[in-house]
Curated annotation (Swiss-Prot):
Subcellular location field: Cytoplasm
Organism: Clostridium tetani (strain Massachusetts / E88)
EC code: 4.3.2.1
The name this protein goes by in its record: Argininosuccinate lyase
Any one Gene Ontology BP term: L-arginine biosynthetic process
Lineage start: Bacteria, Bacillati, Bacillota, Clostridia, Eubacteriales
Length: 438
């Protein structure tokens, strides 16, 4: 059954039917579509547009459709244009002509907008929950591994940090990610139901009722904007893209750290794979896939931005292309967060190796300069002196702490025996605001 056709003489080409149909992907909106329809029909009853018994029959029919779909008795398939026509057609088959009254004072334009907003809100709340679970895992991993390791700039060993402080940086990134999604939910939390095609309706409907019934903060202010707004899709996918960027950065570090060149961590067998030809290989494929899927979500963002960039008000069929990008992006980010959480929950930190790496990279050079500054040497002069000491150490294959006091005094008479305690790697984290790192 088509929801349109009275003004057409010719039949729709089968090629066009298939090309036009969105049922294959928008079928996942079935719950939201039924929920929106129930709120709409209750409003029609409250406004005396439909009789009470008609409202009851329609709601009963919608509930039976939902139950049959959930029980796998009703398959969402067939030659339907979309999920809306699938549900309405099945409703009419079950309850007869009264089912044809469901769409009174409603267009598919406001119908799909409210369905999509409800779905986007629900999946985004699930993503927030998964972020919180990942944050807890990161926090537990950090508390169990408060050991020193090299901190890097330009991927070169720079200064001493702790594994705890390093991994907690991602906790804070996820904190911002969560806030961004919450802000996006706040921005989109207005109901478009009742806007109809673009200009409202001549019926005295109650948009406040349906907005409240469906859990929206309020109804939209402008009918045209209500049906043609897809900012929420763009905002959410933008949020998801930033999450993926953070997960990709963490994945990159896990990949590096698990390599023999670093050997700081071991990713469990559960989240690794092997090689079909090289028996010794243990590959960090989970992390690599997260890193790779980041580009996929970026592509979804560019896709929806491109779809929306040249569309006049109000609804245009181009907007049918909004859903697959969102579905793909939300599915991808949710699965990546869950995989990252599993990977981190079983991660082993090789504490001895992180300590050895600290001792190999002159990571107490800045502290050595600070020592001279505290003795009265201007920082720029201290910086130059320590640079010369590092060059000397490289030539002698020694670390700064391995130089005896006489060697150090060749570079500056301000050095005394207390230098060794001052530049000890653990001690360095007990001074100044560095204490916050621990």
């Amino acid at each position: 059954m088509k929801l349109w056709g009275g003004r057409f003489k010719g039949e729709e080409n089968k090629l066009m039917e298939d090309f036009n149909s969105s049922l294959s992907f928008d079928k996942r909106l079935y719950k939201e579509d039924i929920l929106g329809s129930k709120a709409h029909v209750k409003m029609l009853g409250n406004c005396n547009i439909l009789k009470d018994y008609e409202v009851e029959e329609i709601i009963k029919g919608l509930d039976s459709i939902l139950k049959d779909i959930e029980d796998d008795k009703l398959k969402i398939q067939g030659e339907y244009e979309d999920i809306h026509s699938f549900i309405e057609s099945n409703l009419i088959q079950r309850i007869g002509d009264v089912g044809k009254k469901l769409h009174t004072a409603r267009s598919r334009n406001d119908q799909v907008a409210v369905d999509f907003k409800l779905y986007a809100k629900n999946i985004s709340l699930k993503i927030i929950e998964s972020i919180e679970t990942l944050q807890n895992t990161i926090k537990n991993l950090a508390e169990k591994n408060n050991v020193i390791m090299p901190g890097y700039t330009h991927l070169q060993r720079a200064q001493v940090v702790t594994f705890k402080h390093h991994i907690m940086a991602y906790y804070n990134m996820l904190k911002r990610d969560k806030k961004r999604i919450e802000n996006s939910i706040e921005n989109m939390d207005e109901s478009p139901l009742g806007c109809c095609a673009l200009a409202g309706t001549t019926y005295e409907t109650d948009r406040k009722f349906t907005a409240k019934k469906l859990g929206f903060r309020k109804e939209v202010d402008n009918f045209l904007d209500g049906v043609s707004d897809r900012d929420f899709v763009i905002e959410f996918i933008s949020d998801f893209s930033i999450i993926m960027m953070h997960l990709s950065r963490l994945s990159e570090e896990l990949i590096l750290w698990s390599s023999k060149e670093f050997d700081f961590i071991e990713i469990s067998d559960e989240f690794s794979t092997g090689s079909s030809i090289m028996p010794q290989k243990k590959n960090p494929d989970a992390a690599e896939l997260i890193r790779g899927k980041t580009g996929r979500v970026y592509g979804d963002l560019i896709a929806i931005l491109t779809v929306m960039k040249g569309i006049p008000l109000a609804y245009n069929k181009d907007m049918q292309e909004d859903k697959e990008s969102f579905f793909d992006a939300s599915d991808t980010v949710l699965s990546c967060i869950k995989v990252m959480e599993g990977m981190l929950s079983s991660l082993k930190v090789k504490k001895g190796n992180t300590l050895r790496a600290v001792k190999m990279g002159f990571l107490n050079a800045t502290e050595s300069a600070d020592y001279l500054v505290l003795k009265g040497v201007p920082f720029r002069d201290a910086h130059k002196i320590i640079g010369e000491i590092v060059l000397y150490c490289e030539e002698k294959d020694k670390s700064i702490e391995e130089l005896n006091i006489n060697e150090l005094k060749k570079f500056s008479t301000f050095f005394n025996e207390d230098i060794y305690e001052f530049i000890d790697y653990e001690n360095a984290l007990n001074r100044g605001i560095k204490k916050e790192i621990k």
